[in-house]
């Protein structure tokens, strides 16, 4: 699942990963399953946070990046009309500023145009040129984090209205600690350390998220339908 997302977003991704099973295979010391692309040599930016504050950490990454970027966009807008060679490039950049995929090429073109310009205003923008492109912010974690230990923070982030994405690896148990029942476990489910079976139903995290009215929720299974999972 993580590989599929990185194939879709690649170097445009920022990932905040909760401690747990997804961080064990996702960032154990000396190895990493994440890689760079052949064209630019860059890949996803990945960082591991605590179990209990991963959602807030991911939101902080997004707010911090977008705050710097908003300041740069203001400076870019101020350049309009001062240099005829820059105007067309600036217009294309501003038209796509809220689209991660569409903004990639215009951002690179803007950086090249600013470097060619050499004016004082362009130099000021180029100091933080890595913030010009629109990025995709992701919060990764297992069901122990999303349904239980980190749920309060996750709910806060989802209620904030900020542009972040959340991927929950729902194994329906605490996988990292050996197999205890979690709030994601189904009624009657038997785990290694919950042999008596769970007596209550699975928490419906998807339905809870949908009650906000503006959150897009999808549940996928790669083995069931790869095409639908990609959509």
PLM feature spans:
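N-terminal amphipathic, basic-rich helices that act as targeting or association modules
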Residues: 1-19, 23-30
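Generic structural signal for well-ordered, non-membrane alpha-helical segments
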Residues: 2, 61, 65, 69, ...
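A broad, structural surface signal
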Residues: 3-11, 70-77, 152-155, 159, ...
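Alpha-helix initiation/capping motif
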Residues: 9, 18, 95-100, 204, ...
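Carboxylate/His-rich catalytic cores and anion/metal-binding grooves
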Residues: 14-24, 67, 74-75, 79-82, ...
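Terminal amphipathic helices with adjacent charged low-complexity linkers/tails
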Residues: 23-51
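Thiamine diphosphate
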Residues: 25-26, 35, 117-119, 124-231
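N-terminal leader/propeptide and maturation segments of large enzyme subunits in energy/redox metabolism
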Residues: 50-121
């Amino acid at each position: 699942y993580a590989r599929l997302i990185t194939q879709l977003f690649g170097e445009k991704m920022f990932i905040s990963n909760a401690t747990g099973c997804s961080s064990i295979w996702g960032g154990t010391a000396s190895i990493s399953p994440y890689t760079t692309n052949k064209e630019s040599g860059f890949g996803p930016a990945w960082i591991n946070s605590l179990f209990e504050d991963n959602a807030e950490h991911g939101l902080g990454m997004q707010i911090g990046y977008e705050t710097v970027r908003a300041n740069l966009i203001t400076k870019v807008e101020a350049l309009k009309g001062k240099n005829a060679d820059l105007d067309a490039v600036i217009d294309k950049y501003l038209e796509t500023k809220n689209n991660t995929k569409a903004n990639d090429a215009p951002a690179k073109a803007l950086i090249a145009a600013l470097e060619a310009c050499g004016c004082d205003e362009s130099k000021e923008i180029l100091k933080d040129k890595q913030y010009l492109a629109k990025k995709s912010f992701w919060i990764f974690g297992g069901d122990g984090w999303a349904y239980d230990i980190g749920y309060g923070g996750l709910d806060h982030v989802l209620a904030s209205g900020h542009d972040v994405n959340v991927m929950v690896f729902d194994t329906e148990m605490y996988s990292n600690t050996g197999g205890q029942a979690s709030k994601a476990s189904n009624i009657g489910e038997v785990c290694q350390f919950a042999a008596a079976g769970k007596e209550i139903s699975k928490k419906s995290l998807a339905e809870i998220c949908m009650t906000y009215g503006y959150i897009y929720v999808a549940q996928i299974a790669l083995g069931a339908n790869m095409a639908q999972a990609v959509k």
